[in-house]
Amino acid sequence: MFANSSANTTSTNSSVLQCPDYRDTHRLHMVVYSLVLATGLPLNALALWVFLRVLRVHSVVSVYMCNLAASDLLFTLSLPLRLSYYAQHHWPFPGFLCQTSGAIFQMNMYGSCLFLMLINVDRYAAIVHPLRLRHLRRPRVARRLCLGVWALILLFAVPAARVHSPSHCTYKNITVRLCFESFSDELWKGRLLPLLLLAEILGFLLPLAAVVYSSGRVFWTLARPDATQSQRRRKTVRLLLANLIIFLLCFVPYNSTLAVYGLLRANLVKNSIQDRDQVRGVLMIMVLLAGANCVLDPLVYYFSAEGFRNTLRNLGAPLNTRPLATNGAAGVLTELPSESTQNTGQDATSQVLLQPATLGTPPDNCSQDSAL
């Protein structure tokens, strides 16, 4: 209850609004985020360790997955702050931590959308245009694209942090600090709505369009009668389907509801207080789905990357029975091959790309990039 935070509050003044009753929402968030923290933190920490220490992140898709795991791990590390707030119904920490925590959530959500987009686009380039776009499928290019994604989400994190300053309300003659909620109408009508719409376009709509288009083209190409039939093809399809499911389950519901809520709060659509409250109630559930993406992403690594899966299996094997570790360049994460089905010449080139790279192959060689 709000009264639990009395030790951290100050006396009120008449200009402070009465606190809305968010206790039921806070309890729900505390339960779900506790589960996300308990599962997402070890899973993503383990995934990051496997990518960096065991597989050495030599292939293009593993570069993207490594950065996705880093983004998810950063979000899970911020969850204890949220859990403390939801338990006390009051923000007991300095204001900049509220701003930082709110910005990290936005960074993770839009960063995840962009990294998943890069994974899908890489599969599109490998399967639909293996010759024309092979110059883009190099680890060096992948690392630069990931740096660009981090730069973009950090750029948006600055205004996101500014709008996440704690707000104040009163409960039984004490002042309570709210975080992540109760943005004022003036803020929505000012800089918050334009920032939201820009982030939705660059961080959600464009990645969603790219994921849907690239997945559709890959599925169409692999469904042709002359397509290469292989287990690797099925694993490629499985990876793209997993990315689509994450988008449709985690990101589409939240971002769609958030856009509607923003339009209502900015009074761009005629509405009543009851309409706002109903949409906000839906939004508070959808935000939990968005946060759950950091639990689903490690499952994608496990079921779509054979090298990742074998590494986890070997962790439990006796030391003298474990296979020799590879350097990430040969035989590692080899299930997302470049399969060409456009013509005989392209198919021959694609089959060359399917071969594991030799230990002497330079890291930026395209044959090395063909494997995840």
UniProtKB/Swiss-Prot annotation:
This protein's GO CC annotations: plasma membrane
Taxonomic path: Eukaryota, Metazoa, Chordata, Craniata, Vertebrata
Main location: membrane
Disulfide bond positions: C98-C179
Residues in the Cytoplasmic compartment per record: 52-59, 122-140, 213-243, 302-372
Transmembrane feature ranges: 31-51, 60-80, 101-121, 141-161, 192-212, 244-264, 281-301
Domain of life of the organism encoding this protein: Eukaryota
Known role: Receptor for lysophosphatidic acid (LPA), a mediator of diverse cellular activities.
Sugar-bearing residue positions: N4, N8, N13, N173
Family as reported in the entry's similarity comment: Belongs to the G-protein coupled receptor 1 family.
BP-aspect Gene Ontology terms: behavioral response to pain
Subcellular localization, as worded in the UniProt entry: Cell membrane
Topology in membrane: Multi-pass membrane protein
Membrane topology (Extracellular): 1-30, 81-100, 162-191, 265-280
Keywords associated with the record: Cell membrane, Disulfide bond, G-protein coupled receptor, Glycoprotein, Membrane, Receptor, Transducer, Transmembrane, Transmembrane helix
GO MF annotation: an example: G protein-coupled receptor activity
One Pfam family in the UniProt entry: 7tm_1
InterPro entries associated with the record: GPCR_Rhodpsn, GPCR_Rhodpsn_7TM
Protein's UniProt name: Lysophosphatidic acid receptor 5
Keyword Glycoprotein attached: yes
